[in-house]
Amino acid sequence: GVSVKAWTAVFMLSGSYNTAASSYMQTIFRVQTPAAINGKVKEQCYVFDFAPDRTLKVIAETAKISSKTGKTSGNDRKIMGEFLNFCPIISIEGSKMNQFDVPRMLEQLKKVYVERVVRNGFEDRSLYNDELMKLNDLELQEFDDLKKIIGQTKAMPKTNQVDINNQGLTDEQYEELESLEKKSKKKGKDKQPLTEEEKQRLEELKKKKNNREAAISILRGISIRMPLLIYGAELKDESQEITIDNFASLIDPQSWEEFMPKGVTKQKFNNIKKYYDPEIFCAAGKRIRAMARAADKLSVEERIERITDIFSTFRNPDKETVLTPWRVVNMHLGDCLGGYNFFEQGYETTLSEPRFIDKGEVTANVFAEDSRILEINSKSGLYPLYMAYSIYRTRVKNSLFSVSSIEDEQQIWDKVVAENIFVICKTPMAKSITKRTLIGFRKAKVNTRYFEDLINQIKNKPEHFIKQVDKFVSERTGIKNMKFNAIVGNPPYQVMDGGAQASSVPVYQYFVSIAKKVQPNFISMIMPARWYAGGRGLDDFRADMLSDKTIRSLHDYPKASDLFSNVGSKVDYAIS
C-alpha cells in the first residue's frame, strides 16, 4: 500500500499470464501518486512489461469486458475505447512503437482462437459471435432460406434444422443464461445448488441456445470458402486490412459467383456478416496473409513447404469445386511425368529433400530448360508449382553461376515462372490465387490469363479458344504457334444443369478434347471414370478415347476417396 511520489515507472518482473488484475493494477497505482519533482509536476507514469499478453488481459479485465470469442459487444468496445484514452497501451517491436486501438487489442487477446480458426480452415465455432443466440422471427426465417440455398451446393454435412418457432435470447435472457450456467459450475465452498425453478429456467434457455449450433452449421458452407479468397485477394494498398465489412467488396462479381454457394449474393452475405466475430475474422485473415508473405523470404524448397502447408488448412467448398491436394498433385504428376516429388513412395509423408522420379523420355522432354507447360483452369496454382520446381532444378543444374543465396534462387525461379509456365484461369480470383502460389507478394512476371465463361468457350468455341490461347502466349513471349511440352491439370468435372435433385452434366471431356487439339507433346489430366460407360453426352468422348493409340498410361482408382475425400465416383488420370 506504500506509494513513492518520486517514482514515474514500474517494471513488471513478477507474475504470470494468470496474474489477477487487482494485483497488477495495485502495482501500477504505486507510480500514479501526483508529485512535484524538481519544480515540475508529474503528468505521466509508465508500466513496462515484457509479457504483452498479460498486460492486455489485465486491462480487458479491469475495463470489465470479455476477451472470449464472440462475447464482445458494441458497448464493450466503447467502454474499452474510453479506458484506452485514460490508460494508453504502446507496443514496442524492434525500433517501432505503436499505440493499441480497440480492434488491435481485441485481436491480440483473441489470438489463441485465431490460430485455431486458421488451422481449421474457418470451420470453427470461434469464428462466430453470440448474436446467433438472439435470433428473432425474421432472422430465423432468413437462416431457413439460407439453408435451402447452401444445401443445394452439398457444401456441408447434413444441416441441423433451425426451429423457426423457437426465437433466440433477448439481451436480458442471455445475461440470465450466463449467470445460471456460471452458478451451476461453481465448486467447493462457493458452490450454490440451483433451485428447481432455476434448473427449469436453465433448460428453457439452453433450448433457445441450440439455434446457434444450427445456424453455425449453415454458415459453415460460406465460411470455409473464405480462407482461399483471403489468401488470393489483391489489395492496392497492402497495409489495408481485410475485415468482415469490406470482405465482399474486395471480390469481383465473377469470382464471387464462382467461389460462393450459388444463390448467396453479396447482399445476402452483408445481411449475415453481423454473426461473425469481427476481430477473429480480421486477425485470421491477417494471419493467413502473413504466413504467405513470410514464405517469400525462404529458400525455394522451404517456401513450397510453407505454401503447401497453408493449402492443407483450406477446405473443399463442395463436390463440384475440388481443390486438388498437394499430395494428389504429386501422385498424379509423379506417376505420369516424373520430376522432383515432395512425397515418399507411398505418398503418405512429405520429404525434407524432394526425390527425383525418372520416366525417361517423358521426364527429359517435359522438364527441359526450354520446356513450355500449360495448365487449363488453375484453381490453386499447385500444378504449376510442381512443374516449375522440376524445371527450376534443371536450370540450377545447368546454371553458369553458383546458386548460393536466396536471391540467386529467386532469380532462377522467376525466370522459370516467366519463361516456362503458362496458366489459364476461370476467374480473376483464381488468377490471383495462382500468382500468389507461384511468386507470393513479390513483383515478378507471371503468365496467367482468365477467360470469362471458360467452359462455354471450350465446349462451343474450341477453335476460337485455341486462337485466344495462342494470342495470349505470343503476347507474353513473342512466339507464335508455340508448341507446349505438356498440358496438365484437374479440370472441373461437372456443372449443374438445373434439373431435379441437383442434377448435373459432365464437362471434363471438353477439357481433355481441347488439350488434344492444342497438340502438346504430352497431356496428363485427372478425370472421373464415368466415361468408361458412356451416356450423359460422353459417347463420342468414349469412342475417341478407345480409339486413341497415343495413350501411354492410365491409372484407375475405383475408390475415389484414395485421392479425394467426399467424392463418390471412380477417378483416373492418363498421359498421352
Where are the model-predicted features located?
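Receiver (REC) domain switch-region micro-motif
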Residues: G1, V10, I373, I487, ...
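Short secondary-structure boundary/capping segments
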Residues: T8-F11, T27-V31, A60-K68, S390-Y392, ...
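Extended charged low-complexity segments that act as oligomerization/scaffolding linkers
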Residues: V41-S66, S404-I424, A430-I433, N447-D470, ...
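Long, largely alpha-helical accessory region at the distal end of helicase-like NTP-driven motors
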Residues: D53-R287
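Signature of N6-adenine DNA methyltransferases within the class I
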Residues: V328, G381-L385, K426, K431-S432, ...
